[in-house]
Swiss-Prot record:
Keywords: Aminoacyl-tRNA synthetase, ATP-binding, Cytoplasm, Ligase, Metal-binding, Nucleotide-binding, Protein biosynthesis, Zinc. A motif ('KMSKS' region) lies at residues 248-252. This is Glutamate--tRNA ligase. It comes from Haemophilus influenzae (strain PittGG). Catalyzes the attachment of glutamate to tRNA(Glu) in a two-step reaction: glutamate is first activated by ATP to form Glu-AMP and then transferred to the acceptor end of tRNA(Glu).
């Protein structure tokens, strides 16, 4: 049989990996980690990375899911050299190989009815035998190819399938455990396990990195590859990701979609760094640049054990990257969250200033956008607990005094503002907090913000003075 590559197979490329998701839902973190490991291994070996969309499940595959997968890959910045390729667009190729296999006696048509197969399975179960097809149609020449049928792969009946998994070591499965796999359905569509084999062959895939739930598919796929004379790639089956309760990660553990993490305020660098460490390590190092990941990544350092997802660790990493990445870069991601929360940032400080002010305080960009609304728009009410705590005693007097001094400033800068607050406290013979905290609630609506001088510079003179007066009026109204 002849290879039919959908792209030029460069003979100088010694490693070519692929990520092959099924578009039946979003890109989840398990799939993202698999894609990352596959991508890193290709980059580590100066190889190529292929994106393939395995959409043979016509009932469950959707264009929306495909778009979500591609969006997730792009957000994570995992570019591919070839693709995306769609299995539904390669049905002619799969059927061509199946027809050749039938001609060469490597596969055969099966006309058995559902009733016959159900009866066979029932008999085998009664006899405590492993359910498997009995090859009733292997030498049946009494039917026409035009009659409804499936096509089965003629699996070897003797010996074993042995392969050296790059993560798990030697795996051996007896051929007696394997059935004659259906490779083409009655409707003429090829099945998943067969399409994968032809694609890996045609696309020159040298290393298949995928989840451990595919281990049972591997011997079947290897036997088909051997039958058609195709090279056998190296397989690496990575373990599952569990929640912190030890159960398989699912929706009940919170966000499992890659783009949900984007929506929740995580930077792609943080998620990538977290995912690479979720089953792989390089000494005790926790923080990895992308270049370091590429330089250090090896499949034989991937753990065989399941990993537990820890949101607190991810938040720690996210805050690290918020602090350490260039403010201009973080601000671009932050801008998305302002828009998502309906906050108009056209009238206020530069977003890079927001990042600089709040990097030490916020674990996520969503939190950063939410907690900095007051820089860009008016708030409707004061936080009830903060107002009750700080709008009492001589708060109105302190606010009036500090407003007077702020109004008189010739320059609206950090030093001048700090001096005005300090002088107010000195003249009233109170601690800085007796002025600073009522002022904070007055201008932000809450009891939390960066230092007052930084906050006031960011909000701007006119807004600050108007908000102080509003707070004074509020206090008087409460005391009336």
């Amino acid at each position: 049989m002849k290879l039919d590559a959908p792209f030029n197979l460069d003979p100088n490329v010694k490693v070519r990996t692929r990520f092959a998701p099924s578009p039946t839902g979003y890109l989840h973190v398990g799939g993202a980690r698999t894609a990352l490991y596959s991508w890193l291994y290709a980059k580590h070996n100066n190889g190529e990375f292929v994106l393939r969309i395995e959409d043979t499940d016509l009932e469950r595959s959707t264009p929306e899911a495909t778009a979500a997968i591609i969006e997730g890959m792009e957000w994570l910045n995992l570019p591919w050299e070839h693709g995306p390729y769609y299995q539904t667009k390669r049905f002619d190729r799969y059927n061509q190989v199946i027809d050749e296999m039938i001609e060469q006696g490597l596969a055969y048509r099966c006309y058995c009815t559902k009733e016959h197969l159900d009866e066979l399975r029932h008999t085998q179960e009664q006899n405590k035998e492993k359910p498997r097809y009995d090859r009733h149609c292997l030498h049946d020449h009494n039917h026409s190819p035009d009659e409804p049928h499936v096509v089965r792969f003629k699996n070897p009946t003797e010996g074993s399938v042995v392969f050296d998994d790059a993560v798990r070591g030697r795996i051996e499965i007896s051929n007696s455990e394997l059935d004659d796999l259906i490779i083409r359905r009655t409707d003429g569509s090829p099945t998943y396990n067969f399409c994968v084999v032809v694609d890996d062959w045609d696309m020159g895939i040298t290393h298949v990195v995928r989840g451990e739930d595919h281990i049972n598919n591997t011997p079947r796929q290897i036997n088909i590859l051997k039958a058609i004379g195709a090279p056998i790639p190296t397989y690496a089956h990575v373990s599952m990701i569990n929640g912190d309760d030890g159960q398989k990660l699912s929706k009940r553990h919170g966000a499992v979609s890659v783009m949900q993490y984007r929506d929740d305020g995580y930077l792609p660098e943080a998620l990538i760094n977290y995912l690479v460490r979720l089953g792989w390590g390089h000494g005790d190092q926790e923080i990895f640049s992308r270049e370091e990941m590429i330089n250090y990544f090896e499949l034989d350092h991937v753990s065989k054990s399941a990993s537990a997802f820890n949101t607190e660790k991810l938040q720690w990493l996210n805050q690290h990257y918020i602090r350490e990445l260039p403010p201009e870069y973080v601000a671009k991601h932050l801008e998305w969250h302002y828009k998502d929360q309906g906050i108009d940032t056209s009238n206020g400080p530069a977003l890079t200033e927001i990042v600089t002010m709040l990097a030490e305080r916020c674990k996520t960009l969503k939190e950063m956008a939410r907690s900095s609304r007051y820089f860009f728009e008016e708030f409707e009410t004061f936080d009830e607990a903060a107002a009750k705590k700080h709008f009492k005693g001589n708060a109105a007097e302190a606010l009036a005094k500090v407003k007077e001094k702020l109004t008189a400033l010739s320059s609206w800068d950090l030093h001048s503002i700090h001096e005005a607050i300090e002088q107010t406290a000195a003249e009233l013979e109170v601690g800085m907090g007796k002025v600073g905290m009522p002022l904070r609630v007055a201008v932000t609506g809450s009891g939390q913000s960066p230092s007052m001088d930084v906050t006031l510079v960011g909000i701007g003179r006119d807004r600050v003075l108007a908000r102080i007066q509003r707070a004074i009026d509020f206090i008087h109204a409460q005391n009336a």
